[in-house]
Amino acid sequence: MVTISIIGGTGYTGSELLRILLNHPQVEIKHITSRKMDGVNITKVHPNLKNIKNIDNLVFENISPSNLDSDFVFCATPHGASMKIVPELYETGSKIIDLSGDYRFEDLSLYEKWYNLTHTGELPAVYGLPELHRNEIKKAQLVANPGCFPTGSILALAPLVKEGIIENRIIVDSKTGVSGAGVNPSETTHYPSVNENILPYKMTTHRHSPEIEKELEKLNISNNIKLSFTPHLAPLTRGILSTTHSYLKNTDIDRDIIIDIYNEFYKNEPFVRIFEEGAPTLTGVRGSNFCDIGGFEIDRHGRIVVVSAIDNLVKGASGQAIHNLNLMAGFNETESLLYGGLKP
């Protein structure tokens, strides 16, 4: 049994952390922090959690990070806020899972360039994608939870990059639900703007681009990945469907070989499902911690199309964070996470 606290429990990722952790048999929820909601009952903000275990007795607290006194702390805070909190937590000896982008880059200058923020300083962090960094995560004190777009994109492309069978120029086209924009509404996420519409945004400048590039490059040092990434906001609440395009170096490689490569690469991964026929769907993963991968179509020019589907709030955020918790704590890594998508 471990004690956990959540810093920033009022947003969507905080809500999902609570929803999943309330069914985790090895976890005791100790503190859930919020400055604005100090003293307010958790179920006032998250009524979907009412009557689940002891949640009705918990309130949000405005409490200093150094006073959380927990084995694990989830930082569900905005980019730029975590780096002001994490150093203090790190000194207490708590293990930390940060859901912001603040510790995802080994090169802080890259973070500062793409996030337009000055970083407070480097700490030893492990990139929290279990399928690629499981052993490092188990030993880490600080884990940087991956971004939602990078999660689906990296998992879709990793076997091809690792094998060294594709050219270094890659295109990723992603469609995402509006929950990825966070709990605070904007003109872009306003219902009349997004309903029956698809909105491309940050078409060449999205800050997840270098995160995808750098992680893929670690898989094969001979690769200097040149990624073109364009996200689109779709009239969905949850989910990211990423269609990846790359070119095979050897056009003699056929679809069966590609599928064998993916099955071998992910054969021991509990949350990656390979679809040998057709493409994955968002309804198949909604509400779950799965990443479904399929497509594997090759055109006459040697272009290979691989598609991934994830729930941006679960596998793309809170579910993956809890997967990391399980690894760091030595629990069964699927604990509280092994359930199917909400289809239909």
UniProtKB/Swiss-Prot annotation:
Source taxon at top rank: Archaea
The organism of origin for this protein: Methanococcus aeolicus (strain ATCC BAA-1280 / DSM 17508 / OCM 812 / Nankai-3)
Subcellular location: Cytoplasm
Pathway: Amino-acid biosynthesis; L-arginine biosynthesis; N(2)-acetyl-L-ornithine from L-glutamate: step 3/4
CDD domains named in the record: AGPR_1_C (cd23934), AGPR_1_N (cd17895)
Amino-acid biosynthesis in keyword set: yes
Active site per the UniProt annotation: C148
Entry-linked PANTHER family: N-ACETYL-GAMMA-GLUTAMYL-PHOSPHATE REDUCTASE, CHLOROPLASTIC-RELATED (PTHR32338:SF10), N-ACETYL-GAMMA-GLUTAMYL-PHOSPHATE REDUCTASE, CHLOROPLASTIC-RELATED-RELATED (PTHR32338)
Protein name, as recorded: N-acetyl-gamma-glutamyl-phosphate reductase
One Pfam short name: Semialdhyde_dh
Cell cycle keyword on record: no
Family label: Belongs to the NAGSA dehydrogenase family. Type 1 subfamily.
